[in-house]
């Protein structure tokens, strides 16, 4: 289908055309019609670009070029005709460096729902040019990779793009729009001499104004001695090409004591190795260098290998290899119990876990035969602790630093007299040592079975605490003291001790009147089931109680009397390390229980008492409990936004019960706010069928009600004055009357209304007015009844908006379309009157509207500075006459016309004429397109004036031809959907065309070039249902005419594979033979088995032609103990339609044992062997017994294998031997 589209450049007045044209094939009639699909769109750009440099190309999904075209130079419009359905790729091919999004579009043309059939635009948007540049090494033609390069607008700091350089130093930015930019280079380690440059992008790709320069690269290495890093080794840098000025971050002063050996090298600078043995030169330009190590100790200069190393810096950082090594004394030390402390005797000092020495009485020790390096030294002494130190030993360090004790043992004992009964006795406990220094962490150890423990502690102040398990703590096990403070100085602490503790709990009960019988309970909070009770009794208002022998822990002490109020009905206490006293229970009143469906306020007073007994309670939903200070009968009244079943309730303290209040309705409020005082009516509809619709109104605004109240008050005061005047006499009436004024009514105006709703009721509130519009028009609210609904409805009313306009000059019948901004469909459509005027309203004033106009034959544009006024212009037209070179009309030509926002793609009819009317004045670009033809002019820009009608003649010349044919099955049935192709041969091998047969099996291959030979054949893809074609291809040679009757017969795929075979063997073995079929990946389970019986031939049921690998194996029941035979097997692949297999089975019978008489031939040798064995029987008999035993085992194994061989043996052969394929 070809979709023609049009849109006027000055507005929507131009009629949009959408046509579907069925066009017979050009040339001889072949009884089929070709559906032409136009795929078009725009190359779009917000900046000026040369559209003529851009090509749009259509490829098949396999990469064959189907069509190419250029763009309209005025607006970038393009159109590509398609003559076949299928999958294609549309590509934009701009000049190198230009960027577009997207670059390719995949098309699936089905003639129904694809973008081309629907007439949609395929647009390519220009995103920018490319900017190229280089980062070079100083003095070099190339540069490094990995430099970060950023692009930003000149004068700003924000980065637009970032990239990194490629090998050689090149970099590029893409999608850069015209403007002035700054390019900056950065690198985390390299120094840059020129770190920024500029570039100006106009209407093409641009190059950076100058290259960016890297001043140098960091070079590093390392030095070690016996595997340990060496500090303080100097590395001197020399070069014959690089100057000192080019080297950065390096000490250029001479090195004392160094004598150069090579006068050809120029000294540049030196660096010194660090703690970790590493050294580095911060910035060295590209070039050749020599580094020489130099190391002098306090008393000696050491050799360093290698003594000299040459290296070259290219365009990257360099790690110098190999590692430098310093090549090759007694040292003494002391072990002390603290800084400036005493020596520790008999301490064992270990060097690198190998050399061990003991300290003398003064704590000193001596290490001999030490080479330069870093060592680990560790000292050991009972109850003293030392840290392992790592120290660097060199000739200039003969005296080691003192080894100071860092910690001492802190030991103690836990004594438990009686274990609680509710837990199992434990033998071990965790003990925590915590320092007074908050920055230090806790140390935890575990006691032994006797309760002893020890810590390792540094000098300082500490406290020790036993961690009693939670179960034991709940059971009441407590130790004293809770913490043991101590101070560690320079010796171990061995006297820490903890012992067990018990306690008592006592208290008092105070009553408002006589206490009577009360029960006090003590219940452990941490030990379930441990509960003790005391029964108290007395006719006094105060009593005491005591619980003895209480284990430490948390307890709950409770007093039992449900109908009384207590200051504390229960108390939680914790027995730690002291006795517990001063526990008190005090009665405060009498309990009232109230069950509420909602949170409300209750007002109550006591019958027969004064106002001082009235109380107010704010209660929550659910069961509430509160206390009444005196007994009696109370009247309870609910106050809330809810209506209850009763207006008030009564409660008697002498008959305690639960007071239940259930709400049945809930107060809903609403407000309507308007900017004008108008008639407002509210309709409330309920979701409950039994509730009728409620109409409220006309409502009075709050301002009106306030005014009426003021008027009523003024009138009352006036009447009061008149009354007073009549009483006071005539002189009072001579005074002037008092004038009172009411407030003027000013908006906004509020209209309040309310409604009592049931729980779960859904109400719909709809306001109405003659001149107001409401926002929203109606509101719904669901009253859950869980809480006060409050103001659920808020609606605003506003005066309507009217839109008016005029057409200049006056023009009747112009269609005016009013739409809400962003809406897909128009809101209101009207036509101008005989004066060219219109008026629309009322409309919602808080919305934005768009006003458009259109009239056939006119372009209407909005008048600047007005809202809704338009100017009208008469339209122009263009007529195209397209002829063949024989001057005959040429139908079926796709003509694309575009200009501004207008575009149209139409096919010529039998007369070859196309007319475009209703065109706005301006420039247009046209391009005729038809496969197998070229046109003169091929494309052209034309200027159309207002009201002008142009006539343009176009001539088409035939450049290629078509091949027509059919594809059918052997019985003549047409084959639909077969993919065909024409493949060029010899010099035309780069050309090719493809198509698909229609429902009649017909096909047309277009665009075949004269003088070329093609093979017309089935495509390799898309024909999975076809097995083969007859012939495989047809050879055609294209002249100056179309080619007809290229017919091909195809055979559909058959998915069956037949397998048969025969066995060559003697007929006597046939009853013992089976033929088995296996899949090659599973030789354990046959998928089919066939018995031969009395026939030498066999046939398996049909297999699937699935390309799988199979194995056919012959199996026999002949006993291996009597026959020798090989079971043949053949492997094959299920390809094709049939397979015949021949198997050969030729068993041989085993020979019987030989007669004894034949033994006479070996009698003499056997006699000699017996005599020899007699002389050596002591050695030979054990050997013969062992040999006989082995031979019997081998024979038994062989017999078992022979008797049980058969199918399993054949399977093993099939797995181990390589199969024979046929």
Swiss-Prot record:
It comes from the Eukaryota. Residues 1213-1222 have a biased composition (Basic residues). Pfam families: CarboxypepD_reg, Ig_NOMO, NOMO1-like_1st, NOMO1-like_2nd, NOMO1-like_9th, NOMO_12th, NOMO_3rd, NOMO_5th. Residues 32-1155 are extracellular. Gene3D superfamilies: Carboxypeptidase-like, regulatory domain, Immunoglobulins. The keyword Transferase does not apply. Component of the back of Sec61 (BOS) complex, composed of NCLN/Nicalin, NOMO (NOMO1, NOMO2 or NOMO3) and TMEM147. The BOS complex is part of the multi-pass translocon (MPT) complex, composed of three subcomplexes, the GEL complex (composed of RAB5IF/OPTI and TMCO1), the BOS complex (composed of NCLN/Nicalin, NOMO and TMEM147) and the PAT complex (composed of WDR83OS/Asterix and CCDC47). The MPT complex associates with the SEC61 complex. Due to the strong similarity between NOMO1, NOMO2 and NOMO3, similar interaction pattern probably occur for the three gene copies. This is BOS complex subunit NOMO1. It comes from Homo sapiens (Human). The gene is NOMO1.
């Amino acid at each position: 289908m070809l979709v023609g589209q049009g849109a006027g450049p000055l507005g929507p007045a131009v009629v949009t055309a959408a046509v579907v044209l069925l066009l017979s094939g050009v040339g001889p009639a072949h009884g089929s019609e070709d559906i032409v699909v136009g795929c078009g769109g725009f190359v779009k750009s917000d900046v000026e670009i040369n559209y003529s440099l851009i090509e749009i190309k259509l490829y098949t999904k396999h990469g064959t070029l189907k069509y190419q075209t250029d763009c309209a130079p005025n607006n970038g419009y393009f159109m590509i005709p398609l003559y076949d359905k299928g999958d294609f790729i549309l590509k934009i091919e701009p000049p190198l460096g230009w960027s577009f999004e997207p670059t390719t579009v995949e098309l699936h043309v089905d003639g129904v729902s694809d973008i081309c059939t629907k007439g949609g635009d395929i647009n390519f948007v220009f995103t920018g040019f490319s900017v190229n540049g280089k980062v070079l090494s100083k003095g070099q033609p190339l540069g490094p990779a990995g430099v970060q390069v950023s692009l930003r607008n000149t004068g700003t700091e924000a980065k637009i793009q970032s990239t990194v350089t490629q090998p050689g130093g090149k970099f590029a930015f893409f999608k850069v729009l015209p403007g002035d930019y700054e390019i900056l280079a950065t690198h985390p380690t390299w120094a840059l001499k020129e770190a920024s440059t500029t570039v100006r992008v106009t209407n093409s790709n641009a190059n950076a104004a100058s290259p960016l320069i890297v001043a140098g690269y960091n070079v590093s290495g390392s030095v070690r001695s016996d595997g340990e890093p060496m500090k303080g080794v100097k590395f001197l840098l020399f070069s014959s090409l690089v100057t000192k000025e080019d080297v950065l971050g390096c000490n250029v002063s001479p090195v004392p004591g160094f004598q150069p050996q090579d006068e050809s090298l120029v000294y540049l600078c030196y660096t010194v190795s660090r703690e970790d043995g590493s050294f580095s030169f911060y910035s060295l330009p590209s070039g050749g260098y020599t580094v020489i190590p130099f190391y002098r100790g306090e008393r000696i200069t050491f050799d360093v290998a290698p003594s000299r190393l040459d290296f070259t810096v290219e365009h990257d950082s360099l790690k110098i290899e190999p590692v430098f090594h310093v090549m090759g004394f007694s040292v003494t030390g002391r072990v002390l119990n603290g800084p400036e402390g005493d020596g520790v005797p008999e301490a064992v000092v270990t060097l690198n876990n190998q050399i061990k020495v003991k300290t003398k009485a003064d704590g000193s020790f001596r290490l001999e035969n030490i080479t330069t390096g870093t060592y680990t030294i560790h000292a050991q002494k009972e109850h003293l602790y030392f840290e392992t130190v790592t120290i660097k030993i060199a000739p200039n360090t003969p005296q080691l630093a003192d080894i100071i004790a860092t910690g001492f043992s802190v030991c103690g004992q836990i004594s438990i007299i009686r274990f609680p009964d509710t837990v199992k006795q434990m033998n071990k406990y965790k003990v925590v040592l915590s320092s007074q220094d908050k920055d230090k962490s806790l140390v935890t150890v575990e006691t032994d079975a006797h309760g002893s423990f020890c810590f390792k502690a540094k000098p300082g102040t500490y406290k020790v605490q036993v961690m009693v398990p939670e179960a034991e703590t709940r059971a009441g096990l407590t130790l004293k003291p809770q913490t043991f403070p101590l101070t560690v100085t320079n010796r171990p602490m061995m006297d820490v001790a903890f012992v067990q503790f018990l306690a008592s709990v006592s208290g008092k009960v105070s009553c408002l009147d006589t206490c009577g019988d009360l029960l006090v309970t003590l219940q452990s909070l941490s030990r379930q089931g441990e509960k003790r009770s005391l029964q108290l009794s007395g006719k006094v208002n105060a009593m005491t109680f005591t619980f003895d022998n209480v284990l430490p822990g948390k307890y709950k002490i409770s007093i039992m009397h449900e109908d009384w109020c207590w200051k504390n009905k229960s108390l939680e206490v914790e027995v730690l390390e002291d006795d517990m006293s001063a526990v008190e229970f005090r009665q405060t009143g009498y309990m009232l229980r109230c069950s509420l469906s909602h949170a409300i306020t209750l007002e109550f007073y006591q019958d027969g008492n004064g106002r001082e007994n009235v109380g107010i309670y704010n209660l929550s939903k659910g069961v509430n409990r509160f206390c009444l200070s005196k007994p009696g009968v109370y009247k309870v009244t609910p106050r809330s936004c809810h209506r209850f079943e009763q207006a008030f309730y009564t409660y008697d303290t002498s008959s305690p019960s639960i007071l239940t209040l259930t709400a049945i309705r809930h107060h809903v409020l609403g407000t309507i706010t308007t900017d004008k005082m108008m008639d407002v009516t509210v309709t409330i509809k309920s979701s409950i069928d039994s509730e009728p619709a409620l109409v409220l109104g006309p409502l009075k605004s709050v301002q009106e009600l306030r005014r009426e109240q003021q008027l009523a008050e003024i009138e009352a005061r006036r009447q009061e004055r008149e009354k007073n005047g009549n009483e006071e006499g005539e002189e009072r009436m001579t005074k002037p009357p008092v004038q009172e004024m009411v407030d003027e009514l000013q908006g906004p105006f509020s209209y309040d209304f309310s409604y009592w709703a049931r729980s779960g009721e859904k109400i719909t509130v709809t306001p109405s007015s003659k001149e107001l519009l409401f926002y929203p028009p109606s509101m719904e609210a669901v009253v859950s009844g869980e809480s006060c609904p409050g103001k659920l409805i808020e609606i605003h009313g506003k005066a309507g908006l009217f839109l008016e306009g005029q057409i200049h000059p006056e023009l009747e019948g112009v269609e005016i379309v009013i739409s809400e901004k962003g809406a897909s469909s128009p809101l209101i459509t009207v036509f101008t009157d005989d004066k060219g005027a219109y008026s629309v309203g009322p409309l919602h004033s808080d919305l934005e509207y768009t006003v458009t106009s259109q009239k056939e034959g006119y372009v209407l544009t909005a008048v600047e500075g007005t809202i809704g006024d338009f100017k009208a212009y008469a339209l122009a037209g263009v007529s195209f006459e397209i002829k063949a070179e024989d001057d005959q009309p040429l139908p079926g030509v796709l003509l694309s016309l575009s200009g501004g926002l207008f575009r149209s793609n139409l096919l010529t009819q039998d007369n070859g004429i196309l007319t475009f009317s209703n065109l706005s004045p301006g420039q247009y670009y046209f391009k005729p397109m038809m496969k197998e033809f070229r046109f003169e002019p091929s494309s052209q820009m034309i200027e159309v004036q207002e009201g002008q009608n142009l006539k343009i003649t176009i001539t088409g010349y035939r450049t290629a031809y078509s091949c027509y044919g059919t594809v059918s099955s052997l019985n003549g049935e047409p084959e639909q959907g077969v993919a065909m192709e024409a493949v060029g041969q010899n010099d035309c091998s780069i050309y090719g065309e493809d198509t698909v047969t229609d429902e009649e099996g017909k096909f047309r291959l277009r665009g075949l070039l004269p003088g070329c030979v093609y093979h017309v054949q089935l495509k390799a893809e898309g024909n999975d249902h076809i097995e083969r074609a007859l012939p495989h291809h047809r050879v055609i040679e294209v002249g100056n005419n179309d080619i007809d009757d290229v017919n091909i017969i195809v055979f559909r795929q058959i998915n069956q594979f037949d397998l048969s075979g025969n066995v060559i063997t003697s007929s006597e073995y046939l009853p013992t033979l089976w033929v088995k079929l296996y899949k090659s990946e599973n030789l354990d389970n046959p998928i089919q088995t066939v018995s031969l019986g009395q026939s030498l031939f066999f046939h398996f049921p049909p297999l699937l032609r699935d390309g799988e690998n199979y194995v056919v194996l012959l199996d026999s029941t002949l006993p291996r103990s009597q026959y020798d035979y090989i079971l043949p097997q053949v492997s094959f692949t299920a390809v094709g339609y049939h397979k015949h297999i021949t198997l050969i089975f030729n068993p041989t019978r085993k020979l019987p044992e030989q007669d004894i008489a034949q033994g006479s031939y070996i009698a003499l040798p056997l006699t000699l062997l017996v005599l020899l064995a007699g002389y050596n029987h002591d050695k030979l008999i054990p050997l013969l017994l062992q040999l006989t035993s082995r031979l019997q085992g081998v024979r038994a194994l062989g017999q078992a294998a022979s008797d049980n061989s058969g199918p399993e043996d054949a399977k093993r052969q099939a797995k181990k031997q390589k199969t024979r394929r046929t």
